[in-house]
């Protein structure tokens, strides 16, 4: 009887451990991964690289970008004006806040319009740990 109980408990523990993919990494590792994901997201938008951009999004965010047409939606960003695409590439991360499997990043960039260069207002970007990596949500 004890052997059966042990097998049942071990099986249940193994099943629970497999739920949801790998656990969220430690804080320092998460911060580095989050910053990389956000900067890459903006770079792929600027480049109009839909395939790479969609790979950085959660399922929910991919659906919001057009679901099956997510890549095509982001590919269109390549038609933005050069100053807007450059502003996306120049994004800087100001703060990262992590709470369990969710994170919030505050960013800004520098934009030039009419010969005047200014810091943009902050933008808040949500992320979620999904499929073993931090993804823009």
Predicted features, each with a name:
Residues 41, 53, 127:
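Hydrophobic pocket/interface hotspot
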Residues 82-90, 94-137:
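Exposed beta-sheet edge and beta->alpha loop/turn motif
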Residues 4, 18-47:
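Short, low-complexity N-terminal intrinsically disordered segments enriched in polar/charged residues
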Residues 1-17:
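Sec-dependent bacterial lipoprotein signal peptides
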Residues 36, 50-98:
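Short solvent-exposed beta->alpha transition segments
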Residues 45, 57, 109-111:
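Short beta-strand segments enriched in hydrophobic/aromatic residues
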Residues 4-6, 21, 56, 72:
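Residue-level detector of bioactive/disordered segments in secreted/extracellular proteins
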């Amino acid at each position: 009887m004890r052997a059966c109980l042990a097998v049942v408990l071990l099986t249940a523990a193994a099943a629970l451990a497999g739920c949801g993919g790998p656990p969220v990494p430690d804080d320092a590792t998460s911060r580095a991964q989050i910053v990389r994901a956000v900067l890459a997201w903006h770079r792929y938008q600027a480049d109009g690289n839909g395939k790479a951009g969609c790979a950085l999004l959660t399922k929910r965010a991919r659906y919001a970008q057009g679901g099956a047409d997510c890549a095509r939606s982001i590919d269109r960003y390549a038609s933005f004006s050069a100053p807007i695409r450059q502003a996306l590439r120049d994004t800087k991360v100001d703060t990262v806040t992590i709470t369990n499997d969710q994170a919030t990043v505050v960013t800004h960039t520098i934009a030039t319009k009419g010969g005047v260069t200014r810091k943009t207002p902050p933008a808040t970007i949500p992320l979620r740990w999904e499929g073993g990596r931090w993804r823009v949500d």
